[in-house]
Amino acid sequence: MNIGFISLGTSQADLKTDSTSWGNYENNAWSITNANLKYSTDHGDNWTTATEKSNISKSGILLSTGADDSFSKMGIYDLAGNEWEWTLEYNSNPYNPCTHRGGRCYFSGSDRPADSRGSYFSTTETPVFRVALY
């Protein structure tokens, strides 16, 4: 049985130290390579798989959603981005031990990428939005 993206068989120790097998987190077990990239020559109407030697500077680069089956949990892709979200990962901050991931729509620089991590007060309130298509 699954609750969200976390299997009930996941141990508490794994939640605190290792998320390689169950989440889209910093120490995940998969990697993104050029084989996962695509490019478009017609402004996004059609996408072609890129290789290292492809000319991928024509009209944009796309990291394809669901580049392989390991990117999908329960058939849903790319649910991260444009807002912070709480994770089940722990960090070393004794006052805020839970970790959030992702950037905020009004942040810039190193705080913006979806793979950024941090800790913040759980009572922080900021309006955010996320567009989802499926």
Residue spans for each PLM region:
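Short, solvent-exposed loop/turn segments at the edges of secondary structure
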Residues: 17, 25, 79, 95, ...
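Short, well-ordered surface patches within globular domains
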Residues: 1-63
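Compositionally biased, intrinsically disordered low-complexity regions
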Residues: 6, 11, 25, 46, ...
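Structural recognition of the beta-strand scaffold that forms the well-ordered cores
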Residues: 75-78, 83-86, 130-131
